């Protein structure tokens, strides 16, 4: 089951190359429609959270915490508590990968752009929220490959 993801995070050095990419692809599938639901049910709370994004000069740890909490806010505010339960199982793996990911200025810059676009989409057009989130999640896979190298392995 999903609890396996937390266990796998403990033994990340044994995961096959490309495993993290597969997890990120799952996120591309799950998070965009959930974000759309959140923009319909609780847009103001999401906009409020997005307004507190980190500054470009803040640490990778700050970015990692903020970004993970954004994903959890999206799932919690969606109106369906099952989404939060599913994403919560990704927490340990995400935290393990997020610090090296956010060491890159490119990652932080792309994330800040995503937060801005998402805030505007939530405020003006719920239909574009899904597209904004999907694009950002796909872009994060590309950045992960650049940051971690061609094999995108998990040897963090």
Q: For the regions a protein language model found, what residue spans apply to each?
A:
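All-alpha effector-binding/dimerization core of bacterial HTH-type transcriptional repressors
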Residues: 1-69, 73, 113-135
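Short phosphate-engaging motifs
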Residues: 30, 82-83
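C-terminal all-alpha effector/ligand-binding and dimerization domain
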Residues: 51-56, 71, 88-156
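Intrinsic-disorder/low-complexity, polar/charged segments
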Residues: 59, 77-80, 104
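Long, low-complexity, charge-rich intrinsically disordered regions
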Residues: 76-79, 86-88
